[in-house]
Amino acid sequence: MTKQPDDWLDEVPDNENDDDDDEIIWVSKSEIKRDAEELKRLGAELVDLGKNALDKIPLDDDLRAAIELAQRIKKEGRRRQMQLIGKMLRQRDDEPIRQALDKLKNRHNQQVALFHKLEQLRDRLIEEGDDAVPDVLNLWPQADRQQLRSLIRNAKKEKEGNKPPKSSRLIFQYLRELAESEQ
């Protein structure tokens, strides 16, 4: 048995560099598993998408090929392919993929919100008349002031005469065309 020299304790390095940047963040095994399961669910959502929707999501070639293969495979092979897709997602930044997927999911909600906004603008145009036209022109400079003013006048006459709101619908359609031309 060898004996340790008496000065072996003096060689223990001091922690002179106590930088916060070098701090190791401890992650539990359960948290790693939860993250892996979440990425597998993300992969399953990607596999369930159609080709047109998949084209709108920023994927590299390897991941796209794996997803397309998983769409063709059935039964047990599909499960293994889903595991592979989850593993591929763990090696990549998944945030752009999540954002694109959320955008696809929320497209309907965004469209409904846009329609509500356009309806409110239409109602404001009918109520305030020519005073609200500059606001529309600020939003869409290409808007035709004369056409908008005539539609507003007709909508006011229809409202006063308790007639069907044909011009009101035309104002909404015109505003929707302006909003779509902007996108």
UniProtKB/Swiss-Prot annotation:
Keywords: Cytoplasm, Ribosome biogenesis, RNA-binding, rRNA-binding
Entry's Gene Ontology cellular component terms: cytosol
GO biological process: assembly of large subunit precursor of preribosome
CDD domains cross-referenced by the UniProt entry: YjgA-like (cd16331)
Subcellular location field: Cytoplasm
Predominant subcellular localization, coarse grouping: cytoplasm
Record carries keyword Lipoprotein: no
GO molecular function: ribosome binding; rRNA binding
UniProt cross-references to Pfam families, sorted A to Z: DarP (PF04751)
Keyword RNA-binding: yes
Feature: compositional bias, Acidic residues: 7-23
Stretches for region Disordered: 1-23
Top-level taxon of origin: Bacteria
NCBIfam families named among the record's database cross-references: PRK05255.1-1
Function: Member of a network of 50S ribosomal subunit biogenesis factors which assembles along the 30S-50S interface, preventing incorrect 23S rRNA structures from forming. Promotes peptidyl transferase center (PTC) maturation.
Family affiliation: Belongs to the DarP family.
Name this polypeptide is given: Dual-action ribosomal maturation protein DarP
Species whose genome carries this gene: Cronobacter sakazakii (strain ATCC BAA-894) (Enterobacter sakazakii)
